[in-house]
Regions:
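Conserved alpha/beta core of the MobA/IspD/sugar-nucleotide pyrophosphorylase nucleotidyltransferase superfamily
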Residues: 2-9, 164-240
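Conserved kinase catalytic-core helix
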Residues: 263-268, 289-385, 497
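Active-site acidic catalytic loop and adjacent metal/ATP-binding pocket
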Residues: 366-440
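Conserved core of the sugar-phosphate nucleotidyltransferase
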Residues: 116-191
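ATP-binding glycine-rich loop module of kinase domains
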Residues: 230-259, 277, 282-283, 288-293
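Active-site activation/catalytic loop segments of kinase-like enzymes and analogous catalytic loops
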Residues: 420-425, 431-493, 510-524
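N-terminal glycine-rich phosphate-binding loop and ensuing alpha1 helix
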Residues: 2-64
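Conserved beta-loop-beta/alpha segment of the NTase-like Rossmann-fold superfamily
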Residues: 69-148
């Protein structure tokens, strides 16, 4: 068997990826997420750890460098900057030739960054070959396809329609020596099949092939995934190689989160760092609190918040500055978000009745709020800024084994076990700032918790909510946390025991819902407006 200890794999990741819909404006094709990993990571994990990767980058190439360097530090990687990648006189073959210095002198495999495959290549490194996969005649014109006799290549057809199914060239090739490179160079080739002529070349069928060449294909291939993310504009999430990675189109989002994590590292994941537009940190063991919910766990989370999360702010911040920051964050931001809603729906009027409850308009409720009161007597701490139970990781250690008849064990017994074990919490996905400051108002975190009890963000992410609107009536449905009244009572007692104002916590909940609305797509945006009206009525219409 050929020696694969230092197989060189060339990944072509320099192109624009103009057909990738909303991703085209954010990241290069290599970083398009699929199942919470970018395509390039799916490719790299197909190969042995000792593989040497040469990655050709061009459009948004620094993003690829930043991501791969931060997440795949354990791999042998060489980046090659491709010049003039945007000009019409370039192509995949041009890119391969530009990488000649790093791939000449031995066999190498090359593939496009939008191609995922399952194929055992290790016993096929003693000859030249290309990978093909059958496609229907209706899409034959979208691919280079081959005519062959078994494994023998007869002809490569350049993106022409066929009356029958064809074997499409999947953008995957192994060249056992420099002959293929020499062919490309002699012909000044732009397209990769130009180098096949005169080459002793076999054709191998790829058992499973996924083509992510367009946004429509990405949607189709992603439709079966069950791990649903809840994306915001200009933001992406990855879970890759024991790292959690967040991307924003503006670098400040990663930079500010690192600064805030430095204020309270004990409550945060390990190794929080910035890599350009990416925030990277270690994967936190455990599960989100939503999946491990019991009253003792809720009590322990409040205890963790008091001891580790809500650390006192520096004493050099004046009360006047705190009030100004809160006014900016609570009042000014809310007015800006309402204006965003008006711009988005210029002819829409909010419902007058929500779930059978008569409600006022958003403007009327905002006029009823005593903003000065809301912004006075703050509780200035280090705050998470988005402290619901999807953004907190919980890990529990106990020495008591689960009995075989656990399904019939009294819940009180398990509650007692939970009290004796070790409870670990880790904050994830924290805010960049609070009104431009590193510290903020603890009331906001408490309101986030209360809002997450009333409406389970976990279920919302799974689209287990509904919004129906007819005339001035709206009906909204979304599961709350089971036994929500008991949890709310625990939170209320904790707030009062710590000398805080429960009404202020309750008032901030609909303000938070309202602020979330314009950041999301329909119908969730209107759902949030109606939800805020429903909760405003409970607090202000009394």
């Amino acid at each position: 068997m050929p020696n694969t200890s230092k197989l060189t794999v060339l990944i072509l990741a320099a192109g624009y990826g103009r057909r990738m819909g909303p991703f085209s404006r954010m990241v290069p094709k290599a970083l398009v997420p699929y199942d919470n990993k970018p395509l390039i990571s799916h490719i790299m994990e197909k190969f042995d750890p000792c593989t040497r990767f040469v990655i050709a980058v061009g459009h948004m190439g620094q993003y690829v460098k930043d991501y791969v360097s931060a997440v795949h530090q354990d791999k042998d990687i060489q980046f090659v900057d491709i010049e003039n990648y945007a000009e019409g006189n370039t192509g995949p073959a041009t890119t391969i030739q530009a990488c000649e210095k790093y791939i000449r002198g031995g066999g190498f495999m090359w593939l496009a960054c939008d191609t995922l495959f399952e194929f055992d290549y290790k016993d096929k490194l003693d000859h030249n070959w290309i990978g093909v996969h059958p496609v229907d005649s209706s899409v034959s014109q979208d691919y280079h396809w081959v005519e062959r006799d078994g494994e023998k290549l007869i002809e490569v057809v350049d993106k022409k329609p066929s009356p029958h199914a064809v074997d499409a060239f999947v953008g995957l090739m192994y060249a056992k020596d420099d002959e293929y490179l020499n062919n490309l160079k002699e012909r000044k080739a732009k397209q990769t099949p130009e180098g096949f002529e005169g080459l002793e070349l076999k054709v191998h069928s790829i058992r499973k092939w996924q083509d992510f060449g367009t946004y429509e294909k990405w949607e189709e291939l992603s439709s079966h995934l069950t791990d649903v993310s809840f994306p915001k504009p200009n933001e992406l999430f990855y879970n890759d190689n024991n790292k959690i990675v967040k991307f924003w189109t503006e670098t400040k989002h990663a930079e500010l989160r690192v600064k805030r994590a430095e204020c309270n590292p004990e409550a945060m994941p390990n190794n929080v760092e910035q890599a350009g537009n990416f925030l990277v940190h270690d994967f936190a063991d455990g599960d989100i609190v939503y999946n491990r919910y019991t009253l003792p766990v809720f009590d322990k989370m409040l205890e963790w918040g008091e001891k580790e999360l809500w650390k006192p702010a520096p004493t050099n911040i004046t009360e006047q500055d705190k009030q100004k920051t809160c006014y900016k964050f609570y009042h000014d931001k809310t007015m800006e978000r309402v204006e965003m809603i008006r711009t988005k729906y210029p002819n829409w009027s909010e419902p007058c009745v929500v779930n059978g409850q008569e409600v006022l308009s958003i403007d009327q409720y905002l006029d009823k709020i005593d903003w000065d009161w809301l912004c006075k007597e703050t509780s200035w701490k280090f705050v998470h800024g988005d402290l619901h139970f999807d953004n907190t990781i919980y890990q529990y250690e106990h020495s008591t084994e689960r009995p075989s008849n656990a399904s019939i064990v009294n819940q009180t017994w398990w509650d007692e076990v939970a009290k004796k074990g070790k409870h670990h919490f880790t904050a994830i996905d924290w805010r960049t700032d609070f009104g431009g400051e590193l510290y903020g108002d603890q009331y906001y975190d408490l309101a986030k918790m209360l809002g997450g009890l009333h409406q389970s963000y976990k279920d919302i992410k799974s689209e287990l909510y509904s919004y129906k609107e007819k005339d001035d009536y709206a009906t909204i449905e979304c599961p709350s946390v089971q036994n929500v009244k008991e949890y709310e009572l625990r939170l209320e007692k904790w707030v009062q025991a710590n000398g805080l104002n429960w009404r202020k916590v309750k008032l901030l909940v609909p303000i938070i819902y309202l602020n979330m609305s314009p950041l999301h797509e329909a119908p969730f945006d209107k759902f949030l407006v109606a939800l805020s009206q429903f909760h405003f009525a409970k607090v202000l219409d009394v």
